[in-house]
């Protein structure tokens, strides 16, 4: 049975999750998008700011933007741990035990910062 968990409500988007999927809503298009979670995947954080948001799971990060629509995933390595998630109007920064990655509102993927 599907159970709804937390949600993040922002002026331009909504990010929410259940035990089976993550939901993203683009206010500008009036459009919902979903991505399925894996059988052992759980959402630990939902963070957003401005036009961009991210769902953090035990297996990956899922970036969502009001501009590009859809979810853009980044898989974690086996021993990688999320240390911090910070955001600005057009980007989310995720710091892990092994790298820093950025998802920008106008992009269709994650960028690793060295």
For the regions a language model picked out, list residue spans one by one.
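A short beta-strand motif characteristic of beta-propeller blades
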Residues: 1, 30-36, 70-76, 110-114
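Repeated scaffold domains used in trafficking and secretory/extracellular systems
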Residues: 1-12, 37-51, 78-91
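Short beta-strand elements that form the blades of beta-propeller/WD-repeat-like
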Residues: 7-17, 23-24, 48-56, 62-63, ...
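Inter-blade boundary loops/turns of WD-repeat beta-propellers
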Residues: 27-28, 66-67, 105-107
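Short, surface-exposed linear patches
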Residues: 36-38, 58, 75-78, 85-86, ...
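Short, solvent-exposed interaction modules
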Residues: 53-58, 66, 72, 80-81
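Short, low-complexity, Pro/Ser/Thr/Gly-rich segments in the mature regions of secreted, periplasmic
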Residues: 100-113
């Amino acid at each position: 049975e599907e159970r709804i968990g937390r949600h993040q409500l922002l002026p331009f988007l909504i990010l929410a999750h259940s035990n089976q999927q993550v939901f993203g809503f683009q206010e500008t298009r009036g459009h919902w998008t979903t991505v399925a979670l894996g059988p052992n995947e759980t959402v630990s954080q939902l963070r957003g700011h401005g036009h961009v948001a991210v769902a953090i799971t035990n297996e990956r990060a899922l970036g969502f933007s009001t501009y590009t629509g859809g979810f853009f995933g980044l898989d974690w390595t086996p021993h990688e741990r999320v240390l911090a998630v910070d955001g600005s109007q057009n980007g989310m920064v995720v710091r892990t035990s092994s790298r820093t990655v950025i998802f920008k509102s106008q992009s269709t993927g994650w960028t690793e910062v060295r």
